[in-house]
């Protein structure tokens, strides 16, 4: 039994005698305070990371090439499991042949497949693009929807694509875009323990102010491409290193 002061939460409420415990029981309010404190520190670190990323990549923006929201939607669908660089090599010919939703909806499926073949999963992507454009015409008056729920009705569109289209097509920030770079970096930075993109997005939305949600994603993507790569990250060159638990852990190991 520990000797010394008896904490209030160690006492029997009826007799006032010390409970038979080997360590002090932490009251709920204390546990809650610790949790809040940890979250507050993580949020402060997230904001410092954002400041540094803004300094590193002040002009960062979406790297996909497009002229209209329909083209942005199509390019973002094509970017699934593919680099923006590869997509940008495909879209000039694609949009020259099929510049809008009507042209894409009426496109010959085999011709569409051939044009997007090099982006991977080309059959599914071509089918989704054609069907999505037909839905835009029939259901949304030929306009790419501005509502998250409506965008998610389109084939080939999950939250990542919807967030990109809303943010860069309409300036509407409703979520955090989570791609492979954002997932990798936020896990390494200790900002999330999840692997599911929706859960990662939820964690990040709690840490970063809403106006910066898309700025955060874009700059993490830039940093993931340039420094914090999937293999052989350049930690010795990283200006985020002293805020990164993965770097600190590797030094201990």
Q: Whereabouts are the PLM-identified features?
A:
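Short intrinsically disordered, low-complexity segments
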Residues: 18-19, 230
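Ala/Thr-enriched low-complexity intrinsically disordered regions
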Residues: 14-15, 35
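Short, Lys/Arg-enriched N-terminal segments with co-localized hydrophobic residues
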Residues: 22-33
């Amino acid at each position: 039994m520990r000797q010394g002061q008896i904490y209030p939460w160690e006492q029997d409420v009826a007799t006032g005698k010390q409970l038979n415990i080997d360590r002090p029981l932490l009251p709920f309010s204390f546990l809650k305070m610790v949790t809040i404190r940890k979250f507050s520190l993580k949020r402060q670190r997230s904001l410092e990371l954002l400041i540094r990323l803004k300094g590193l990549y002040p002009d960062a923006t979406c790297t996909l090439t497009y002229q209209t929201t329909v083209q942005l939607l199509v390019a973002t669908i094509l970017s699934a499991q593919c680099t923006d660089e590869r997509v940008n090599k495909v879209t000039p010919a694609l949009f020259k042949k099929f510049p809008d939703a009507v042209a894409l909806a009426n496109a010959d499926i085999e011709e569409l497949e051939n044009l997007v073949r090099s982006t991977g999963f080309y059959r599914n992507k071509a089918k989704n693009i054609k069907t999505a454009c037909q839905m835009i015409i029939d259901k949304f008056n030929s306009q790419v929807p501005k509502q998250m729920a409506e965008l998610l009705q389109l084939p080939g569109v999950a939250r990542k694509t919807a967030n990109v289209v809303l943010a860069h097509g309409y300036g509407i920030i409703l979520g955090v875009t989570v791609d492979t770079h954002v997932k990798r970096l936020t896990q390494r930075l200790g900002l999330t323990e999840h692997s599911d993109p929706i859960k990662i997005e939820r964690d990040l939305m709690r840490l970063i102010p809403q106006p910066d949600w898309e700025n955060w994603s874009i700059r993490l993507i830039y940093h993931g491409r340039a420094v914090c790569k999937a293999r052989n990250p350049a930690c010795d060159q990283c200006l985020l290193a002293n805020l990164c638990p993965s770097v600190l852990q590797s030094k201990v190991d």
